[in-house]
Amino acid sequence: MTDKLTEICDTKRNEVAARKGAVTVSELTARASEQSAPRGFEKALRGKAAEGFALIAEIKKASPSKGLIRPDFRPADHARAYQAGGAACLSVLTDAPYFQGHEDFLVEARAACTLPVIRKDFMVDPWQCLEARAIGADAILIIVAALSDQQMAEIEAAALEQGMDALVEVHNEEEMERAARLRSRLIGVNNRDLKRFVTDLATTERLAPLAPDGTLLVAESGINTHADLLRLEKCGARTFLVGESLMRQADVEAATRGLLFG
């Protein structure tokens, strides 16, 4: 695990331990049962990717490497703009210490649109899957670099039990091999090197041929233009996760449309 990722996950484990003490499993289960059914995150992506480009548009206020990204941060407005611009799904950052995220941002975004939403956070405990469903998440993220094979399998099983999908994120060949051992065939390639925090679209191009049969490959990070989508389509990627380059635009809807359709 990279140093920054180790630090973030250590912080997250302490945070989860504290939250576990503040709410019972039965309370979370009750909240989860009150939520509307999962909206079908992977299904929505596969449907869009079958006819064109599928976009997971990210609602992100800040990041450790870039600081504040969107000063006038309004999750509900951004969600509506992304949907109007043609996004297939949303990603909402809920990590507070490093990304200035919050659970409420996901709740607000999901209520403002009809798109499936992934809770973008650092999953270190299966308990977080129940918590994610309790706030309405339709999918969760599994970062291979942050977890052992057993931890990944347990978190994936907990997500599936709640009817959610799991986006499995990799950055190199070894992680792709480990991701293939899971049931999920929704695999994201992070083009950002978490050790050096530089991005290179060639990462997706290199790893795409190694994805297991039946995989819906998601290219993540460093994607800024329609030309980037056309480049990555050549290696088989038709699904993309984009946040920062869209969140920095004054007109998010127009920027989303421009990214998808040129």
Swiss-Prot record:
E.C. number: 4.1.1.48
Pathway(s) the chain acts in: Amino-acid biosynthesis; L-tryptophan biosynthesis; L-tryptophan from chorismate: step 4/5
Record-level Gene Ontology MF annotations: indole-3-glycerol-phosphate synthase activity; phosphoribosylanthranilate isomerase activity
PROSITE patterns referenced in this protein's UniProt entry, alphabetically: IGPS
Keyword Metal-binding attached: no
Biological process according to GO: L-tryptophan biosynthetic process
UniProt KW keywords: Amino-acid biosynthesis, Aromatic amino acid biosynthesis, Decarboxylase, Lyase, Tryptophan biosynthesis
Pfam families assigned to the protein according to its UniProt record, in alphabetical order: IGPS
Catalytic activity, as annotated: 1-(2-carboxyphenylamino)-1-deoxy-D-ribulose 5-phosphate + H(+) = (1S,2R)-1-C-(indol-3-yl)glycerol 3-phosphate + CO2 + H2O
Similarity field: Belongs to the TrpC family.
NCBIfam families, sorted: PRK00278.1-2 (NF001370), PRK00278.1-6 (NF001373), PRK00278.2-4 (NF001377)
Protein name, UniProt field: Indole-3-glycerol phosphate synthase
Taxonomic lineage from the root: Bacteria, Pseudomonadati, Pseudomonadota, Alphaproteobacteria, Sphingomonadales
